[in-house]
Amino acid sequence: MKKLLLTGVFKPFGVSDEYGEALCTMELLNNQVTREQGIHSPRSNNPSFGLYLMAENLEIPATVLDFPDWEDFTKEIRNGNYTHVGISFIVPNVLKVKRMAEYVRKHAPNAVIILGGHGAGIPGLEEIVDYDEVCRGEGVFWLRRYFGEDVDKPILHPVSPSAVRKYVYGAPIISDAGIIITGVGCQNTCRFCATTHKFEKQYTAFLSTGKEVFDACVKTGAALKVEDFALMDENFCKSPKRARELLVNMESHGKAYTFSTFSSAETIGKLGIDFLVRLGVKFLWIGVESKANVFEKTQGIDLHALIADLQNHGITVLASAILFMEHHDKQTIHEDIDWAISLESDLLQFMQFGPIPGTRLYKDYDAEGKLLKDIPWPKQHGQDEIWFNHPSFTLKETATYTRDAFIKKFQTHGPGVINMAHSYVKGYITVAREVAERQKRGMTWNAETLRYEETGNHAPDEFMKLRLEAMKRSALEFRPVFKAAELYAPNIAAAKKARMVAELYEATFGPPTLTERVQGLAVRGFAFVESIRAKDGDVMRQPGTIRHEWPDRHGAVPQATEENHWVRHREHKRPQTAAAASRE
Ligand code: SF4
């Protein structure tokens, strides 16, 4: 009987030791978006979604082990009787995988070791890790094929939250959301992009229709008691038919779900703001990359106007910019950093132009002899020093420029959470006004043209009423942080902005309720404790270990796992400093 373990790499994360680096924390926002924002930075870990999706869609019994510590992992190997052990990892974690594979060889010598994830593209991987099989692309179909199962069976979507161990200002107040993995890959073929190359420049849909996406939302929503979802897809709206069907399904069922997702700028323009608002998009990650407009996806688009329009309609924007591109020298890099900040996105990622194995950029730089091959893999994460020769910067300078870019954004626009709150309340005001105006003018939504059109029908837009309620809920989640944001603001302008946003909330939603006032006081208390801890260095908490088993499903009617295993995973109750985590 075959039995598969699917595991991520072991913790601690974000700790400098022989396997990893402090600047690689396994936290998306804190690591590379709200970096340098101290206690204002939202903290969370995203589960290894792919592992759950793969386990859900196999017939053989499978176990997922996410965020294990070394003891969890070794115990699982010793006691699990696994015939196959799959390890998913990114490039900087390859030395952890090496240690894990060595342990498997010793304690489960008959187990087949399968590697996958973005780290699987490392050239000469076999010289680092002792493994048997490698999946360099999409995993669900690869594993079905590998185990001789029916590749064409429908895809079942697992229930999973988008993040665990969530807090800001040290307070566990970030609300839950589900994750919906609609597809992987992107056809835009940007030269540096690991995703497009990993999936061979093709898009693979797991949920091809709007109905399938809606059903996955219903299932996850019921299990996790959420109405908010992250759509894991590089460019969800690039499949407009599916997005339109999703909206039709939500409208017919009276469900005004909200979504966070990724989109290229060109796609947003094609669908239009009215559609995005109606669909419930509340957070967009957009690759703006560089002022030099070197990528097709941003050419001819007024990004300043686009981002402002999104924010004015309640869609918070995370813009992503790239440092140390070929055209950057000591003057143009400052121009690009200033330009990226001038976009006034709520959040701003700075990522280094890193040649990641498997990408065209890596091949080009390898051929040109630009790669610095003696730089260890754990250092190749894009937030410290670059790992290639750049004619205008020393390695040390690249670390400093990167850090300083984040500091400049923080000093210029203040905490990201306040920017997001501002966009949510502005959006609520705008959309409420537009809904009222349209009713007055007798305008109704045309699902074909994706526009509001004058029809003489003055009936209220019932779905937009639900949408406004959902927008209000999204906005009010931020209310407890205002005072802490003001008290610990990085400068006077940021403190003023926190006050201004709090006043705008009061004018829009009325004075805070008793519950909101108590929550605000609690966040201030948490923030005080967090600020003391932060004085000793960054406060690094480790995610709890998540373990879930899928039974043998040979011959079973395909049925998604309904059990909400997310309430059962073991969490570390107390926050840990980086040093404590390292000792663990
Ligand atoms: S648009 Fe984004 S996901 Fe697509 S190839 Fe470019 S960087 Fe990658």
Model-derived features with residue positions:
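Acidic, low-complexity intrinsically disordered segments
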Residues: K2-D228
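Radical SAM enzyme core and accessory elements
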Residues: K2-L28, I77-T83, N110, E385-E584
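Flexible glycine/acidic-rich beta-alpha junction loops that bind and position SAM and/or redox cofactors
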Residues: F13-S16, I122-L125, K241, L323-Q331, ...
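Alpha-helical structural signal in soluble globular domains
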Residues: N57, Y103-H107, D130-Y131, E245-H253, ...
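Residue-level detector of anion-binding/catalytic polar loops
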Residues: P61, V112, K282, T316, ...
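Structural recognition of alpha->loop->beta junctions
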Residues: L125-L143, I273, R278-L284, E335-F350
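Radical SAM [4Fe-4S] cluster-binding motif and immediate context
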Residues: A163-L318, L323-M325, Q331-H334, D338
